[in-house]
Regions:
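A generic structural signal for beta-strand entry/edge sites
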Residues: 1-3, 48-50, 70-72, 94-98
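Short, surface-exposed coil-to-beta transition loops
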Residues: 3-5, 58-62, 82-87
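Short beta-strand segments that buttress and anchor functional surface loops
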Residues: 49-56, 73-79
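Short amphipathic alpha-helical signal-transduction/dimerization elements
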Residues: 122, 126, 130, 134-141
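Beta-strand/loop substructures that line and gate deep hydrophobic ligand-binding cavities in soluble
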Residues: 76-128
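Hydrophobic ligand-binding cavity/cleft-lining segments
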Residues: 1-42, 139, 143
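A short, structured loop/turn motif at beta-sheet edges
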Residues: 11-15, 65-70, 89-98
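Generic structural detector for well-ordered beta-strands
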Residues: 7-11, 38, 52-54, 63, ...
Length: 143
């Protein structure tokens, strides 16, 4: 498995940052690897919402698995080849917020033997997404 964690400090209030990030149709605005993201099931952000996402030439269907309004969401996509599990946590920090983006990419089945080999690529993808996230939230990347 490849694991990536980024933390962004933002002047935006927690509620605002969470509202933006929990709507996965905003993905393409901050992650340069995402070319499109459209909600295909559900009525706005929340548990069970589904999004069709085109990322790094892969068509994904993300499902929001856990949702704690204003604080945390977990969403997952699974293809024949890999499973992507992402968690966004937003907490108050002063007048702004701190956002933690935690992503895990696991190759499925026998491909799992190659997990170590994908870590550098996943780090590059994560670094680009983290930079876009910090920029979009008018924040700074702190880890």
């Amino acid at each position: 498995m490849a694991h990536y964690v980024a933390t962004v400090r933002s002047p935006r209030p927690r509620e605002e940052a969470f509202a933006y990030l929990s709507d996965l149709s905003n993905f393409e605005q901050w992650d340069p690897g995402v070319s499109s993201s459209t909600q295909v099931s559900g009525d706005g952000p929340g548990p069970g919402a589904e999004y069709a996402v085109r990322a790094n030439r892969a068509d994904l269907r993300y499902v929001v698995e856990q949702y704690r309004a204003g604080h945390e969401l977990t969403f997952k996509a699974r293809t024949r080849f890999f499973t992507s599990l992402d968690r966004v946590t937003v907490v108050d920090e002063g007048e702004g917020s701190r956002v933690v983006y935690d992503a895990v990419l696991t190759l499925n089945g026998p491909l799992g033997l190659l997990d170590v080999a994908i870590r550098p690529m996943f780090r590059r993808i994560g670094d680009a997404a983290a930079a876009g996230l910090a920029d979009t939230l008018d924040g700074e990347l702190i880890t």
